[in-house]
Amino acid sequence: MSLMTKLGFRALVASCLITAGSAANAQVNVLITGVGSTQFPIATANFTNEANLPQQVTSIVRADLARSGKFTNIDAGSTPVPETASVDLGAWKAKGANAFVAGSVNREANGQYKVNFILYDTVKQQSLGGLSLTATDTTLRTAGHKIADYIYQKLLGVRGVFATRLSYVIKTGNRYQLQISDSDGQNARIALSSTEPIISPAWSPSGTKVAYVSFERKKPIVYIHDLPTGRRYMVSDQKGNNSAPAWSPDSNTLAVALSLTGNTQIYTVNANGGGLRRLTQSSSIDTEPFYSPDGRWIYFTSDRGGAPQIYRMPAQGESAGAAQRVTFTGSYNTSPRVSPDGKLLAYISRTGGGFKLYVQDLQTGAANAITNTNRDESPSFAANGQYLLYATQSGGRNVLAAVPSDGSAPPQILSVQGGSVREPSWGPFMQ
């Protein structure tokens, strides 16, 4: 959300319901609107014994690869091919596939499934290995995502993010839902349902907790939701606004924006709610903190120069070193997010009356808009740094979009039927 929107919310009387683990009726749907300029052709044969499964693993693998914009699926026919089969790699190369995947799904005596697959390089005529995964009826989708991750890393040299998760807020009528889903928007679960706004979800580095801001008590308060247990607890309920939680890389601390003394300033608080410490000491508005991946710096938005810009200070606060301005392209920049490798800064810039997602090289300072949308907000990097998830508008609706962080392909739109979806946060690699 915009800087002033996040700071200016007034809460009303709320009624919240924790519903950890309950399935979501409204799920995010992915519309693939564009692909990269260079795609890797791959054929994924049907796995043996998967025809009657609750989830067909190969369908998930193919969909993941297509959704990445990095692959094109070559028709592998309808005949299942197990990982133990002798494969004519030259024939698959002749069909246009530079890689081929074969596999099987076998039900074991305990009711679980054993999912095996092998990946071949048809150009070099060699095996690239495979995995043997254990799954249940409810985790077959995860197995498919893990296979796609393996393929992505072996063929492109970068770890895949298909087995990661998303968090976002869906608004339907007068109800808000904080949902957790697979990276493709499927398998969505409701973490929190409320008649009052929920904003700023932020994943812990471990992927087991989500911090967020709820307005259920007539003011913005920061909570942490523990996903494995469904338990949540209050982290910051200071006087005034409590907003914009951001995790430290070690998961022990949250940076937050508080209006405790008047103007909003940056503080840190222990993940258990104690140890409050003020980091900025300005007479301006300082908000939207975000840690660098090495934990040395906190990036934040401040209007100390007259208009919102991105600044950086030592993680110990301005007492350890003066804040330095980072963004110089554009006169109004907010919502800093640093890539997992620490090399890129994503932010929202007001341009031509709209708001666009920009990415800046932190070494050179070069910054470029990477979207063709014009109402962008809330950027979030994928765990491998190759994609950005953000909120925008499309066809008059509030939607999410995913775009390569280098801007090499158009955004893919993620929408929800009958509602609006905002406040995205892309989770870390699963442990």
UniProtKB/Swiss-Prot annotation:
Signal sequence residues: 1-26
Region ranges (Disordered): 406-431
Keywords: Cell cycle, Cell division, Periplasm, Signal
Self-association state and partner proteins as the record states: The Tol-Pal system is composed of five core proteins: the inner membrane proteins TolA, TolQ and TolR, the periplasmic protein TolB and the outer membrane protein Pal. They form a network linking the inner and outer membranes and the peptidoglycan layer.
One cellular component (GO) term of this entry: periplasmic space
Alphabetical list of Pfam families matching this protein: PD40, TolB_N
Organism for this UniProt entry: Burkholderia cenocepacia (strain ATCC BAA-245 / DSM 16553 / LMG 16656 / NCTC 13227 / J2315 / CF5610) (Burkholderia cepacia (strain J2315))
The protein's name in its UniProt record: Tol-Pal system protein TolB
